[in-house]
Amino acid sequence: MLYTDDVLNGIIDTAASSESFRDQCQAEIDALYTDNEQSVLWQCMENKPDLIQEDLSRIIRNNLNTSPPAALFRGISKKTMEYLEDLRYVGAIIEFNRVMSFSRDWQVARNFASYSFYGTRNIFCINNAPYAYNYQEAIFKMICGAPPEEFNGAYPEATRKSNLHLVNDEDEFMFPAGTTLRVDLIETHPLNNLYTVWHLTVLN
């Protein structure tokens, strides 16, 4: 979680009522990203289609944060579990050809890995990553800076509010395509034996 509920609600109210606040947020985004790059980042609110993978990976590499959280988590999908079938050992090297999203919040990863979503009950944990892209920070500011007409529906500020809550809760960080990882440990979670945790180190 980026902000507490009280702070988040204050930001939401300011974004809805203050054009100067929105302009300031947008100016900060414009200083970092082109219009095309902003369009790519907006699309990631829903998913990360093949069409934007190359551009998204480039954006990530150009805007890496070298002080990410000490631990980042990701619920493992069924498709990824198939890929990992022959990599269930310490020292195995994992490389993905797509952008990968992680969260600083264990609960977010657990929810994705649970039976209500992926159903694998397996979770990646990257420890002490040398870098990551703070997508949450970027898209949060973009949503704050967007004019009301950017949001669909009869109640644009309600859409802004729900989007900001979603982004705030997911705590999303990204790694570019081609990131190489090493398996350091595969263990049952010590506080929840229903889940298996893959501890990983970023190699490149």
Kindly label every feature range from the protein language model.
Residues 1-204:
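Mono-ADP-ribosyltransferase
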